[in-house]
């Protein structure tokens, strides 16, 4: 909306107020009004003289413009009007020298980098972690087994020290804690305070260690003793230096005298004898400055009279004494800031420049006990100090002011424990406190950018506003903060803390800000709080201009600022009007008529026409803006019914019944002695549960007619009702604005032309509705170009299936849902829209305020530590076609719709064409055939498939990573391995077939000798049994029948042993599908088949082929074969071919051994595995 305002302060010039949404040209808008960037010292001096010479030393709008043109500073009309409104802080359209200079100062303050580092929350805001120490006595020392050096090189210091990506803070990169107690016990803890191991060692009073990770600089081990001496051991960290493990020596003891004499070449000693006259309390060596710091306490005031060197800095041969009364107990050296912070028994914290020892830069007072620990956070500009009474104080390093006093340690640690040890982990930003308990306190922890983009406020954001004059965003939160942001750079310009407060029992309590708005010229800010207080702010300089209040302790839920009037509504159930006219602003406020019967939850105004207010019980009342008189009243439960503007008897009865039922239910919860409620009363009460109104919105561009829906009412049921604010108008339509059960719209906004409606829900969803043709006459409806909307809103593009958001509105043509995505994890309390760059901003209950493009792309979170996207108020955001990222917290819970809308990427998909009937029939036939084949051949194996076998124990879910230190000479590998407990292995049962083979006799598988031995012919006549002969009746006639007798080999005895020199090739057997270890028995003589033994006197070894024998079809060359467990069928030796060229032997050769009279059972056996012996023909055998 464009607002025109004419003032008569300057008779020669009228001021016309315009915004960036006005009709000004683009060139004029881009001209900056940053006067402090264009003015010089000489020009400022000349302007001062012109102000002094002006009448009354004040100038008007035209006079100031002529003065600026005299010093060569020119602006166009649009830019100068905005500049004059910014300078005119008194709102009187006259400018004096003080206002002019104040505007220049504010411009320079906005560019101050220190204003960006002011914290929104206390440095120590998280609950501490407490654990038992597991020591027998109290902890006397605590330190850190470091993985990284605390002394970061100066060239590695960057601005990213305030946030981490998660990997740097892992325990593997953070080291281990080490605690020691008086009994000499050491315990090692992980970074998350998990116990690792314990050991026993001798205690050392004072020690410090300095090293670099790169290993280029010698490490320093600094020792301080009771006599005030300081000794330094320097050594190279290469291959662990003198700390290398030696085989057979678990502990190496050194004598200091041997170290001084140089008997240990790896150690370079240096001594500072009697550096202090008292016990060394703390030592530190700075590698960056190559300087030693050592402190001591001097409590004997009579002896030293307050001129004691509490801290001595030694650099080469130069010594600087920092003289402090009572000495120094602890100190901290910040090499980044070049400062030294000391604390001692005098309860003062002193800040020194390391190069100036004459006097401290600042003295911080406030402790009531001696200082026992100090440390500095240079990135946050904070100093932490702990006193003897266990009170932690946080100081600002630049302003030297107290930020926080933390006293929870007094509650956690018993008052009798006084010897407490402290250690600060600079990498994790954690303070470890050790006594009889281990306490871990987080001090300004880094932001995990892998989990969140950061927070805008320290509490839920309640109101977010955009100022069109100064082009900035103002956020108000329940932490009572008001913050001014530059949305184009993401920088925080101004922060105002403790805006609304009240005193309760002497303690100042912050009050939550619940409502806010700007004045018509958008120069001042009006805020309302939960206690009923109202304040007017000049938020450019954080000055309260005026204080007001409605009824005490009544929350302000809505504020409206129109010309010369301020309207405030809340839990007082009426409208309170304050004057905004000069001279009458401090009079009594005007109370409008009290027609509401419940608390007012929301309100809105249409300039020049009317005001609408809504209550928790669903009442809606339209008021005349000029007179404050109501003219229409509705109830959202029955919106079409006309309700007179008075309480009748029926409404009073319903009100009394509702109050009665509420009281009865409350009493029934507290006590069971109350009588039961009647069923009809419960039914009546359930039917009259009120539906509350969450938000109302006036459409400023729609006229006041009966046909135009100009008011949108959001209910807690998720429905938005549309009304006409005409006298004879009323309820028109309603639509469902959510897609999840239990959700509702909490805030609404629209653009300048009322084309889109932006809603924020209780579940964190942001929805955009196209309302151009919704609830207007058909004659005024316009054509909607859907392709253009699909280009801007990716939500409208087609998907493979309807998502939840689209399913809820598929039968709802108007209004059209053009975008829906989850923007926050919690409820959205405020939403707004910037017209020219098309940016949506939302404030949520999750402490953040985020910026989005109109299409749904994520631009950033105000207050983030990450780099900000490049934005400008004159160009549309989101048109660079780059890849947009998702908020880390939303990425974990986002749906497919949210991922598509925020990222702007829609994955392609293909729709399958429905197949014809013939193709489906063919596929069915193929499937049936495949099923039959599978049923026949592909039967599943029986369980268990592997049989009974030994199963290995399962591995741990966490893989054990073993890293061996190869620098040691002796590596005990077994200490790194995980050994499983030994268990008795189950003896597997022996298979029945193996047991049968073991008990069998190999002679049972051969034919008995039925014939007689002819000694003259030296032949063995073997006759087959009749039963076996009958089995061969069906043999194939094409193959020659196997002979039952052996071919006449030459033998030397009746036992049938072959003579030496006989040819083995004439008595050859072919073995098929049998074991190579087989023996053949024939009559009294036996032939043994052994491995690799040649026959005596034979020219070459006779081998038996293990391959399947080939049967020739020629009857002149028959070949015999036998099966496993069957009688042997031998062919005539005359037909056997013994030539090696015709048959190749297999790799596993077998030869007949002439000297063996008996076959060995272990080497030659034919077992009947397949059953009883059975004679077959040659064709069946093959």
UniProtKB/Swiss-Prot annotation:
The gene is WDY. Gene3D superfamilies: YVTN repeat-like/Quinoprotein amine dehydrogenase. This is WD repeat-containing protein on Y chromosome. It comes from Drosophila virilis. Residues 1031-1182 are annotated as: Disordered. It comes from the Eukaryota. Disulfide bonds: none annotated. SMART domains: WD40. Residues 1079-1092, 1103-1121 have a biased composition (Low complexity). WD repeats lie at residues 155-199, 323-362, 366-405, 456-495, 508-547, 595-635, 740-779, 823-862. PROSITE patterns: WD_REPEATS_1, WD_REPEATS_2, WD_REPEATS_REGION. Keywords: Repeat, WD repeat.
